[in-house]
């Protein structure tokens, strides 16, 4: 997308000033409508180092009540976060209905870094892109408004800004080694960025490339895009109809009525012998999956009083208590109900080498 992108004509300073006042006022008014309509908004800022992602976020949030937003800076994943699925730490950040989440970098930056380092390529890249597209589509299908901005500056402008930051000890920390590497390998990075933008540009979550060569012009582009999209989201919500969401292919299993339980019994002595043997085997497997860093999810469903709790107890007796967690799932709490249905399950996923047991 970057290779074919042409920046819009930048207006005169006086026009930018007038339009900024209008856009700021509109966003201030719309924040209450977002709350009333219970529309969750994710605003993702990606782009070149020193392109103004953080400063633009700072200007935008001045027009929103602090109670209605949060800002998350997604730096390099920690060793702990690397033990979870790639999208885990981003799913944790999604906002409640009626609120905003601003992300200073996100899944694009991490994916492009992995591509540039050679950590993912070919089939690995394709799988990553597929998972990102599903992730974004799940959210937008669930009523989330997702705004994705890429802050674009040329190589000379990036170098100029980095020099200004590096010349002062109080701002030197804002230029990372990767930012400097980006500028040295600008063409290589631009190729990766452009490919990623094309691969993840969807009608439900399109990319907006922002000409960030001028700070106020960049702020205006972001604000006007936010305002127009919020207005459309509220109109769409008023005319929305229920749709079948997130359909995945399922394995064929027998119907419950076709399962004969009459011969599924054994005497107590045989049961105790097999239980002891299988618990011993399960304990060995638990050690192996920890060494191989394999995460395991065990899910229980069934009628009340069907024996789920007792079965879980007999399984956990064989496991190292440091390597598993049992999650009883009841009706969602208000803060859970205000987010995507899967949020409360994503936040309970096991890290690699561990087991999560869901009681429903």
Located regions from the model:
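Glycine-rich phosphate-binding loop of ATP-dependent small-molecule kinases
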Residues: 1-360
């Amino acid at each position: 997308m970057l290779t074919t992108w042409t920046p819009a004509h930048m207006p005169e300073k006086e026009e930018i000033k007038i339009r900024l006042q209008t856009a700021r006022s509109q966003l201030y008014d719309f924040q209450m409508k977002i709350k009333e309509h219970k529309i969750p908004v994710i605003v993702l800022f990606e782009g070149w180092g020193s392109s103004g992602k953080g400063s633009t976020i700072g200007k935008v949030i001045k027009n929103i009540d602090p109670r209605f937003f949060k800002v998350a800076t997604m730096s390099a994943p920690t060793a702990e976060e690397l033990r979870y699925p790639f999208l885990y730490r981003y799913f944790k950040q999604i906002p409640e209905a009626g609120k905003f989440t601003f992300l200073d970098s996100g899944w694009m930056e991490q994916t492009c870094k992995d591509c540039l380092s050679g950590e993912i390529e070919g089939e690995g890249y394709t799988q990553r892109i597929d998972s990102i597209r599903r992730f974004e589509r799940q959210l937008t299908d669930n009523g989330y408004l997702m705004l994705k901005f890429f802050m674009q500056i040329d190589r000379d402008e990036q170098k100029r800004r980095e020099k200004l930051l590096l010349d002062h000890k109080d701002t030197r920390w804002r230029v990372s080694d990767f930012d400097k590497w980006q500028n040295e390998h600008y063409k290589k990075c631009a190729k990766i960025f452009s490919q990623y933008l094309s691969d993840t540009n969807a009608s439900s979550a399109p990319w907006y490339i922002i000409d960030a060569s001028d700070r106020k012009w960049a702020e205006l582009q972001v604000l006007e895009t936010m305002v127009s999209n919020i207005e459309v989201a509220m109109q769409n919500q008023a005319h929305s109809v229920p749709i079948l969401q997130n359909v995945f292919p399922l394995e064929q299993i027998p119907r419950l009525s076709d399962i004969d339980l009459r011969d599924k019994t054994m005497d107590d002595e045989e049961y105790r012998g097999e239980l002891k043997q299988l618990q011993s085997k399960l304990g060995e497997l638990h050690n192996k999956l920890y060494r191989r860093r394999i995460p395991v999810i065990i899910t229980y469903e069934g009628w009340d009083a069907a024996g789920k709790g007792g079965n879980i107890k007999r399984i956990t007796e064989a496991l190292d208590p440091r390597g598993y967690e049992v999650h009883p799932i009841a009706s969602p709490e208000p803060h859970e109900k205000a987010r995507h249905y899967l949020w409360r399950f994503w936040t309970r996923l096991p890290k690699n080498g561990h087991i999560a047991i869901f009681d429903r």
